[in-house]
């Protein structure tokens, strides 16, 4: 049993360090409420490149914003991740947060989900496999080596970013690793279709689901960006729609639309075990004698054993050196 939190708060748009500092403040806040896990939206650092929907790619406004966005993408590890890591250490929090990542020696950006442990260590990094629609002008494609869960003292946590959650095989890879809490950071505004997908994942995986949507209002933009006149005065550009669901696919917190808020829920992991008594998609209901799954040439058994097949891929998985992560 433990409290989990979905943090629906706007980023400090196009200012990566300010975003990290806001995240640190929210981490402290949810810790005071007894939470052990905090989940932030997709691309919380440095915000969503929403200008793609409001201006032509060959316009001067677009070019200026695109350059600024790329400059505010973060390296991992870096000053922004250390800011978040320090907050995790100070408050013994586990955190999942969306960022735009820029590798140190490459020109490609990635839509990345980072996991931090209560000791400040970066426990995992998942790069979005398939950017959606015009997102392909912004982010590159991740590979399967980052489809991994993380072990925490409270639960096995995994996640997918936005429309990745519609990919059944990607979900199955996480299920085979014993996922108990599924985080789904998104830019989706909590539509009925999105909430239906979250219910499906909770029902299919028999686990807790934390969906955290991006909240962005015209009033949240920096003055110089608002002054470009691309966005209607006072408009809600993304309404958030965050929600927390239990393993019976019931919404127990939210959905929260158009407001800055933090959702909390008591997440009892015993509920996941009980729910799987009737249906276990990769266990007794998986029919591993009929179905199989491979990921980058590694066979993923549909029956969870004592060891994860993902360990066969460990040589290909990025890890933060302990000396760096500990600062």
PLM features per residue range, with description:
Residues 1-6:
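Extreme N-terminal starter segment of soluble prokaryotic enzymes
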Residues 8-25:
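N-terminal phosphate-binding loop and adjacent alpha-helix
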Residues 16, 28-118, 188-205:
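Cys-nucleophile CN-hydrolase/nitrilase-fold catalytic domain and related Cys-dependent amidase chemistry
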Residues 46, 50-53, 114, 126-132, ...:
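Short beta->alpha transition motifs characteristic of CBS
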Residues 76, 81-86, 93, 101-181, ...:
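Active-site catalytic loop in hydrolytic enzyme cores
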Residues 96, 158, 208-210:
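Structural detector of well-ordered beta-strand residues that form the stable sheet scaffold
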Residues 214-327:
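C-terminal beta-strand edge segments of enzyme domains
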